[in-house]
Amino acid sequence: MEYINRFYWLIALCLIISTGANASVNPKPFVIPELKEWKGSDGAFVPTEATKIVYAANNPELERIARIFAQDYQTMFGRSLEVVQGKGAAGDFIFSLRADKKLGKEGYTIRVTDRVALSAPENIGVYWGTRTLLQIAEQSENHQLPKGTLRDYPDYPLRGFMIDCGRKFIPLSYLQDYVKTMSYYKMNTLQIHLNDNGFKQYFEHDWSKTYAAFRLECDTYPGLTARDGHYTKKEFVDLQKLAEQSYVEIIPE
């Protein structure tokens, strides 16, 4: 009987130790889309006034991504982070390029220890990684990041959305904001439907009576554009350039 009691006490002790060990491991952070791989450790990285954003290579695009991250961080959290080139140290965000065939073109790795090391095979992966960092940081008052290692990559090369501006004019400012929102959630394609007729059921089911809207400026037929709103060529090109900076492709049709 004494042997059995000792056996049960031993099992209970193992369960307690196991539960305590698991409790100290950080769970997978909530990110949209869901992270592919996560190996948690314990503790958290908390940015300080001395935290810098360090890009590790003489790469103009990597520097641009670092500055976009700094700008977004300032906008979202009200804290200014210095952007520098170098190796980085404890307390810093460190961005670098590193070959990894398993990650593909858009994948990335983030290791959170006493620093945050974000690496990817290509610049676009680093950019998507910054969106993940912002999403996680947004979820706590001190913008901490749980310590651990994550690897992430998309399931689909095209992650898109189509918006109908033909039947209903949508202001340019809304489209600009929409591009930024799409990029935040790693969507990379926006198809803009520019020309169409209204739904015929509202016009006696007669297509010839429906309102035909052409939303993009036309040099060949200057009077063709819709009376209730359109985009100039320059406005639309500028929108496409803005989207490119966030790795979003705009497809007009």
Question: Which stretches of residues belong to each language-model region?
Answer:
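Bacterial N-terminal signal peptides that target proteins for export
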Residues: M1-W9
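Short amphipathic alpha-helical "recognition" segments used for binding
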Residues: R6, G78, N195-N197
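A ubiquitous, low-specificity "background" feature that marks scattered single residues
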Residues: Y8-I11, I170
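Acidic, contiguous N-terminal accessory segments
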Residues: L10-L13, A21-P154
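Feature activates predominantly on carbohydrate-active enzymes
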Residues: K102-E253
